[in-house]
Amino acid sequence: LPKYGWELEGRGSGFLSPDFNAYSEPSDDYRSQSVRIPYYFNIAPDRDLMLAMTFMTSRGLTYEGKYRQLIAPKKTAEGEHSIWEVEAKYLFDDKITGLQRWLLDTSIELDITDKTHLSAIYKRISDTNYFTDIARTNSEKTLKSNLKLSFDDPSTNLTAHILTEHEQTVTADPGYQRALETSISKTYRADKKSPIQVDFN
């Protein structure tokens, strides 16, 4: 919940608690400092937005935004939602490297119809040292992006999907790109006890 804010038609918006951190740069003789100030917008019951600024004494000011939106109820038994999320971070001029540093992370889960579902993830960073230099973490080793279109019709026992995938590594190792993959599966029932499944890949 916002630490300082107000209520607009039952929805709260306001500043969230700031974050203060100390960290070390390889060339530093002393500890550098950072402060992150986030602001939360509760736009509507089905969408929100968070904006933040992070100032690092050694590198400069990073701008950040994250938007989330529920699109429509899913028709699946799990009762989840179709959702779109996008997050971006941008440092215009790194005072140490002189480079522009950025991160982009977006995903969507969307029921096109009650039988057709689209799933997409796109993740990218400006360079392999982004996480250690700017995010101050080295937990991420690879960034996987993919696009998958699925069809499932229980009434006809027919399923199909199209998938493509790409990977960006955070190390010096080269990433990979997966060739377009298609799959179709159909189950025929000669009788209730002996189903026959036919797959095409």
What is each stretch, according to the model?
Residues 1-201:
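Outer-membrane beta-barrel proteins and related beta-barrel translocases across Gram-negative bacteria
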